[in-house]
Amino acid sequence: MFSSTTLHHLPRPNLLLPRKVISRRMSTNPAIEPKVRKFESVEGVDIGSRNKSDGFFAIPLYLSKLVALYNCISLSRIGTSNENFVFSGIRFRLVSYNILAQVYVKSALLPHSPPACLKWKARSHAILSVLKNLQADFFCLQEVDEYDSFYRNNMDSLGYSGIYIQRTGQRKRDGCAIFYKPSCAELVTKERIEYNDLVDSIKADSVSCSEQKIETSNEGKDSRKDSRDLNDPLVRLKRDCVGIMAAFRINKPFQHIVIVANTHLYWDPELADVKLAQAKYLLSRLAQFKTLISDEFECTPSLLLAGDFNSIPGDMVYSYLVSGNAKPTETIEEEEAPVPLSSVYEVTRGEPKFTNCTPGFTNTLDYIFISPSDFIKPVSILQLPEPDSPDVVGFLPNHHHPSDHLPIGAEFEIRRE
């Protein structure tokens, strides 16, 4: 709707024109005009990890800058007639974005958002516009609920192939998708991650004990079958959350293999232990997958993990992912994490002030993690708005952002093994 402050700036409509023509002309303005920011260079910034098992060792900043300068010179020489020239690296871009499933878009839940910005037609076109403008080689998307009916074909028209996993609950319609450019990478293999498997592991570990404790009704049925008691771990852990991981062979010049994982952990802050259990299961699966790829292809794959972790910097999940210790403030022996990780934003420019922006909650929930190695480094990151930026004032979604989350992204350079 037009406010009283903007109406007097509009040209006076021609009252002789048919009403339908006027309506058509006024509707040409989209409800959402996406605001997409640029990537900024972080070359020369060293990243590290408490675990150096992948062969990563920090080098002095001045040496990093010399390496970056050499790479820039090398890249500029591609295509020259010098046959002795050796290509030093190849770059690709990864973006993670919780696009807000349309099934969760209700005016009652988002009263701060302009109604026109919540309509599927406006949002879907705006999301596609954002993705197109970001020009990533990989997209890790969460809350994808129209994969077959909308995203698969539309992303295909933009030059992307996709893999997808839907949430496991019967009434859950959204899931996680990884879209990638076949011109950049070849899909080698993939695996699903279903966090409800945690329930099965508990059942397997305690089946004999459970058989003794479970009371049955007069009909002989399991009285816990329909239980909603969150004190019951079989109920507490069944949150229908999922993830997906895949190995990609980066095309020319030296076909390095990169593992890309995308996930969406449970949201409820009251179930922090559930989110931590999911994070631990995630890293254990990633470690197994990485070993599988290493053995099968006799290589050292790089690993990138992205998604909506529903965890703020410094909480148990975040601390576990970057240090292996869920409670860093306590003087306890660290638990060895299966995969060493560093947050790309944290080790370059610091975590964003927020990636989720609503009246009830504004903070950082989305991350891109990297397992540090000699073979891959971040060279740029996607800029994010400040809290007082005009395009986020009034919270999200709005006329500039089709989701309540912001996209995050990074560009990486792979060097020859």
UniProtKB/Swiss-Prot annotation:
Recorded catalytic activity of this chain's protein: Exonucleolytic cleavage of poly(A) to 5'-AMP
Temperature dependence of activity: Optimum temperature is 25 degrees Celsius.
Subcellular localization, as worded in the UniProt entry: Nucleus; Cytoplasm
Listed GO CC annotations: chloroplast; cytoplasm; nucleus
GO molecular function annotations of the record: metal ion binding; poly(A)-specific ribonuclease activity; RNA binding; RNA exonuclease activity
Pfam families xrefs: Exo_endo_phos
Gene Ontology biological process terms, A to Z: nuclear-transcribed mRNA poly(A) tail shortening; regulation of circadian rhythm; rhythmic process
Gene3D superfamilies named in the record: Endonuclease/exonuclease/phosphatase
Keyword line: Acetylation, Biological rhythms, Cytoplasm, Exonuclease, Hydrolase, Magnesium, Metal-binding, Nuclease, Nucleus, Repeat, RNA-binding, Transcription, Transcription regulation
Expression induction or repression: Expressed with a high amplitude circadian rhythm showing a peak in the late day, just before night.
EC number of the protein: 3.1.13.4
Activity across pH: Optimum pH is 6.5.
Disruption phenotype: No visible phenotype under normal growth conditions.
Record's subunit section: Component of the CCR4-NOT complex, at least composed of CRR4 and CAF1 proteins. Forms homooligomers.
Family the UniProt entry places it in: Belongs to the CCR4/nocturin family.
More info: Plants overexpressing CCR4-4 exhibit retarded growth phenotype and severe reduction in root length that is attenuated over time.
Descriptive protein name: Carbon catabolite repressor protein 4 homolog 4
Gene: CCR4-4
